Amino acid sequence: MALNPLEQFKVYTIIELPRLFGYDVSFTNSSFFTMISVILMILFLLFGIKKGSVIPGYLQAAVEYVYDFVISIIENNTGSKGLQHIPLIFTVFIFILSCNLVGVLPYSFTVTSHVIVTFALSMVVFIYITIVGFKEREVEFLRILLPKGTPSWLAPIIIIIKLFAYLVRPVSLSIRLAANMIAGHTIIKVIAGFIVNMNIFFTPAPFLFIIALIGFEVFVAILQAYIFTILTCVYLSDAVK
């Protein structure tokens, strides 16, 4: 794997299952680490809120901090109207965060490095926001395609541009997340492979450098979950404001 840094993103079958309606539904390493990420996410939340103490322990404090953090993102971008959509946005944030952090572990698989996963997640958000927009604002929601004060002769061009920009939102969301996760993991793998091949891994400087890179990748994992969430809230603001 050190010689091929992209091998870590390869999907392979763990348990082969019969095809369903012509589609391969075998249990893969991607399926396994998605399941692990979801289980860890659920355990984190369940054990964090289990006691509900007035004076929280470390785990409860962590859950409350994450929850308050997501609340602040929603309020800053959508106002109080966006708070009713906490379940979706919080779930999106904690799921992406869990998948990203699991992907940092050695010999794991980064689920969010595959566009098919991030695009599916982006489409769920996109469809949800579109439904909310028409439900909350009805036909008024279409005004996002034509800013106020636009000259009538320019309106057709602006509408086409705005419509295209709206439709590519899930594409940009998915590619941004996947590309950043691929880039970060590839850089770490290339540098780590070089250090191992040079037989200098256990000398202080390279070892500390690898630790620093892993720490940076953890930061990127958290940052990408934050960026995906804040963009979701920005798009949601068009639907509720």
Swiss-Prot record:
It is found in: Cell membrane. It is a multi-pass membrane protein. InterPro entries: ATP_synth_F0_asu, ATP_synth_F0_asu_AS, ATP_synth_F0_asu_bact/mt, F0_ATP_A_sf. The chain crosses the membrane at residues 29-49, 54-74, 86-106, 114-134, 153-173, 177-197, 200-220, 221-241. The keyword Transport applies. NCBIfam families: ATP_synt_6_or_A (TIGR01131), PRK05815.2-4 (NF004482). Pfam families: ATP-synt_A. F-type ATPases have 2 components, CF(1) - the catalytic core - and CF(0) - the membrane proton channel. CF(1) has five subunits: alpha(3), beta(3), gamma(1), delta(1), epsilon(1). CF(0) has three main subunits: a(1), b(2) and c(9-12). The alpha and beta chains form an alternating ring which encloses part of the gamma chain. CF(1) is attached to CF(0) by a central stalk formed by the gamma and epsilon chains, while a peripheral stalk is formed by the delta and b chains. Its main location: membrane. Belongs to the ATPase A chain family. GO terms for cellular component: plasma membrane; proton-transporting ATP synthase complex. Key component of the proton channel; it plays a direct role in the translocation of protons across the membrane. Keywords: ATP synthesis, Cell membrane, CF(0), Hydrogen ion transport, Ion transport, Membrane, Transmembrane, Transmembrane helix, Transport. One of its GO terms (molecular function) is proton-transporting ATP synthase activity, rotational mechanism. This is ATP synthase subunit a.
